[in-house]
């Protein structure tokens, strides 16, 4: 609606705009006229606004589910596995009640149609009895409609307690009628209007009001221009009236002729009036009978109202007892919860104390571990030094053994060489003697030959 007003605003400002020259400075252009209606926020900030929107969203969600109940009833085999037995049982009961209501309404319309057809031919007493039976049947529709309302609430309660089934049902949008979809679209549109209203801050509302006042002021200026134009029109109308007066003379002659025609029609009007009076008397008698019947119905409705009040009082007492019982159980559960939470808190404190002690002991063990690591590193360094010294000593011992062995070998070699040298000297003398003997033997052999 606000956008429509803004769309019409330039039409009201047309006379003033036409007076402005075509050349304007771009740097001096006015601000955006729609700026006061642009919302500065996109999200709700107050709890009350969020609650209002959540209530409306919940209502739309329930309407979406209720409008699909007829589709569920007509596709029971396909939907039974998706929604469950409890929901399908409630839907079948709801469908049975709706069928009973539709059958009663159809029968009631049929009786009213028959009564309308036979109203002129039958007697007045018989008509009263038929009308009384129809009214009684109409009064019996109210409890049935209440049962249908309760059944609808029961189906919604079961669907809301089973979110998965509700989501599956909500996806079956092809089963919704066009009228139901239009109703849901209207609710969604209402939600958009309400959301925009809740997003509007008091400052924005004042700006919008100021903006509308400016538009109203511009409208008043335009109205002054219109008044001026109307004055010009009035002057021209005076000139036109002079011409009209000339034509009025011709019209007056036609009226005289019409007056004569009306005189002839007065007789027929009198006859029609007499017939209307007769019909009025007949209608008055019928209305008296109808008033008596309505008074009887009022007495019956008053007795039904008293009975319903008594029944509702008994139901209210039962609900009050049930409410007191539920509140007592809730208090017991709260006390039990507080006791258990106290025990859990004590246990948590004990565990926290044990945790702190374990943490302190862990720090002590870490400190000792650092000391032991330092001692271990020192011992390992000492062992490495000792092993190096031992290896050096062993290597020195090996060198000494090798040197002693070498010295012994050299000494033994020297002794052997010296011994061999002495033996060679003695052997040379013996060899010379042997050679001399061999030569002599050879010479003797040659001489024998």
Swiss-Prot record:
Transmembrane segments annotated in the record for this chain: none
Gene designation: IQCD
Protein name according to UniProt: Dynein regulatory complex protein 10
Main location: cytoplasm
InterPro entries hit by this protein: DRC10 (IPR042815), IQ_motif_EF-hand-BS (IPR000048)
Single GO cellular component term: motile cilium
Domain IQ: 400-429
Protein's UniProt keywords contain Cytoplasm: yes
Basic and acidic residues composition bias: residue spans: 430-449
Segments for region (Disordered): 422-449
Location relative to the cell: Cytoplasm, Cytoskeleton, Flagellum axoneme
Pfam families xrefs: IQ
Keywords of this entry: Cell projection, Cilium, Coiled coil, Cytoplasm, Cytoskeleton, Flagellum
Task of the protein: Component of the nexin-dynein regulatory complex (N-DRC), a key regulator of ciliary/flagellar motility which maintains the alignment and integrity of the distal axoneme and regulates microtubule sliding in motile axonemes.
Coiled-coil regions listed: 90-125
Xref: CDD domains: IQCD (cd23767)
Family membership noted in the UniProt record: Belongs to the DRC10 family.
Subunit structure: Component of the nexin-dynein regulatory complex (N-DRC). Interacts with CFAP52.
Native species: Homo sapiens (Human)
Top-level division of the source organism's lineage: Eukaryota
């Amino acid at each position: 609606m606000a956008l429509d007003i803004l769309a019409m605003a330039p039409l009201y400002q047309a006379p003033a705009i036409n007076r402005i020259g075509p050349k304007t400075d771009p740097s001096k252009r006015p601000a955006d006229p729609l700026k006061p209606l642009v919302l500065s926020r996109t999200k709700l900030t107050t709890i009350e606004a969020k609650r209002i929107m959540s209530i409306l969203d919940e209502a739309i969600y329930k309407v979406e589910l209720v409008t699909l109940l007829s589709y569920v009833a007509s596709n029971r085999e396909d939907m039974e596995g998706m929604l469950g037995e409890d929901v399908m049982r409630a839907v079948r009961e709801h469908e049975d009640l709706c069928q009973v209501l539709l059958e009663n309404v159809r029968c009631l319309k049929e009786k009213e149609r028959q009564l309308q057809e036979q109203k002129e031919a039958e007697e007045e007493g018989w008509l009263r009895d038929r009308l009384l039976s129809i009214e009684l049947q109409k009064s019996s529709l109210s409890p049935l409609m209440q049962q249908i309302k309760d059944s609808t609430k029961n189906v919604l309660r079961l669907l809301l307690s089973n979110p998965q089934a509700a989501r599956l049902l909500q996806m079956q949008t092809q089963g919704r009628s066009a009228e139901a979809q239009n109703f849901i679209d209207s609710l969604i549109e209402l939600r958009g209007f309400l959301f925009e209203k809740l997003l509007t801050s008091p400052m924005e509302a004042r700006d919008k009001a100021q903006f509308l006042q400016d538009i109203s002021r511009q409208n008043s200026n335009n109205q002054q221009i219109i008044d001026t134009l109307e004055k010009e029109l009035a002057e021209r109308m005076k000139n036109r009236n002079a011409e009209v007066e000339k034509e009025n003379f011709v019209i007056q002659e036609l009226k005289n002729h019409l007056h004569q025609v009306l005189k002839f029609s007065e007789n027929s009007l009198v006859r029609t009036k007499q017939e209307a009076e007769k019909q009025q008397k007949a209608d008055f008698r019928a209305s008296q009978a109808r008033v008596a019947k309505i008074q009887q119905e009022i007495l019956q409705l008053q007795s039904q109202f008293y009975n319903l009040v008594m029944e509702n009082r008994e139901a209210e007492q039962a609900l009050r007892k049930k409410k007191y019982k539920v509140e007592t159980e809730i208090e017991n559960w709260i006390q039990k919860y507080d006791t258990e939470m106290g025990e859990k808190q004590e246990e948590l404190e004990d565990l926290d104390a044990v945790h702190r002690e374990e943490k302190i002991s862990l720090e002590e063990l870490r400190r000792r571990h650092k000391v032991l690591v330092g001692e271990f590193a020192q011992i390992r360094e000492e062992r490495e030094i000792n092993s190096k010294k031992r290896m050096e000593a062993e290597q020195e011992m090996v060198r000494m053994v090798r040197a002693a062995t070498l010295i012994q070998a050299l000494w033994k070699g020297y002794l052997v060489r010296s011994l061999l040298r002495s033996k060679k000297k003695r052997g040379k003398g013996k060899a010379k003697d042997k050679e001399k003997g061999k030569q002599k033997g050879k010479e003797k052999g040659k001489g024998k030959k």
